[in-house]
Amino acid sequence: MSLIKDSSIYLIGELSAKCVPFLLLPYLSRKLGVEGFGELSYYQTFLPLFVIFIGLSQDGAVARYFYVYGKRSLNLVVKTGYAYTLSIGGLGLLFCWLMQSEIMFYLVLSAIFQVFLSVQLSIRQCQKQAIPYTFIQVSSTITNAALTILMLEFYQTDLVEKRILAILISNVFVALLSYLIYRKRVNNKKFYFLQYKTAFFYIMSFGFLMIFHHGSFFIRQLDRIFIFHRFSEAELGLYAMGAQIAFILSVFILAINKALVPYLFEKLKQGSVKLKDLHRWSLLSLLIVPIPSLVTLIVPEQWLLFFLGKHFIGVKYYIIVFLLSTSLTIPYLFLVNYLFYHGKTKEISFCSVLSTMIYLGALGGLIFTDVVYIPYASVLGALGILPVLYKITKRVEENEYATH
């Protein structure tokens, strides 16, 4: 019962944290306009890149250390990771200052505190503190939204910069608050230089490999950078808004997947669900894939414009295409969960890299056509990996039978 209760709390927190930014969309679309939303999307693309190199997946390193070695010297890893983040982040801030890029300065500073915050969330999750974890997560989202509204109502110019500044202040406030609470509860044991050195190499060895994994997620945001430099901010605004709205479906798909995976793994362990069942379900789910796009197709665009503002004429097309690529996650999850069950991380990484390569190949060709064709790069990337996953899962099943 405790497991179900904690899972429910995590799920509620996850959905609540994801819902608030979507509820903010109509406000942002009206305040920033199409061009402003496009510019904001362009700058926000750099935030995950900065987090990758400044953070080196410290949240994952902390979680692994806790489960493998326990919590006795967990603070050593936390403090060493924070020192690394401040050092690399400091260099990034110095570079932005020399280049006189105020917005990039804010983004690097925001990335530093986002790393701090993700580590604090990881600690709470490891220690099964579901309510504090959810409280921090929801507080961060609500503070972010409240500060955004406050800044955009108070100022009339440079609104994109003010939105980024609101994100920064929110990250700083919640990260510092959660760290102060953590400091009060942790034993401030003294560590020696050699121990810090060992912890540093642990973080580097773990995080360096994860750069490639997380880098594939960033690469899928490159379309926004290309569009910003090749087309207009207004076209990027429509494109980014379409992707943002379609992402709502992704949140629900991943939330349902997160809830069902424990039951799926249990059925696989019992043998009541086999790979042939997953293959059949994956194939049948292809019938579901076009449904969200078809439903959106019959929705009058006036309804969307009422929601987003009259300047977003044409956004419906992008929502339809991005919903198609997002829906392709359903057959993908049926297959990739089988690999997760058998711990085939190399095969999963290979599929991620291959899907990214298909996406980049398609993007490289479509970027020289028209902006309306660029979303199909995501569709091709999601669709192209399915036959490969089918063959890999089949091979994994054969190897499992051979070893048993």
Swiss-Prot record:
Location within or outside the cell: Cell membrane
Transmembrane segments: 9-29, 36-56, 76-96, 103-123, 135-155, 162-182, 199-219, 236-256, 288-308, 319-339, 366-386
InterPro entries in UniProt: Polysacc_synth, PolySynth_Transporter
Membrane topology designation: Multi-pass membrane protein
GO CC field: plasma membrane
Main localization of the protein described in the UniProt heading: membrane
Keywords carried by this UniProt record: Cell membrane, Membrane, Transmembrane, Transmembrane helix
Similarity field: Belongs to the polysaccharide synthase family. HI_0867/HI_1700 subfamily.
Listed name of the protein: Uncharacterized membrane protein HI_0867
Organism encoding this protein: Haemophilus influenzae (strain ATCC 51907 / DSM 11121 / KW20 / Rd)
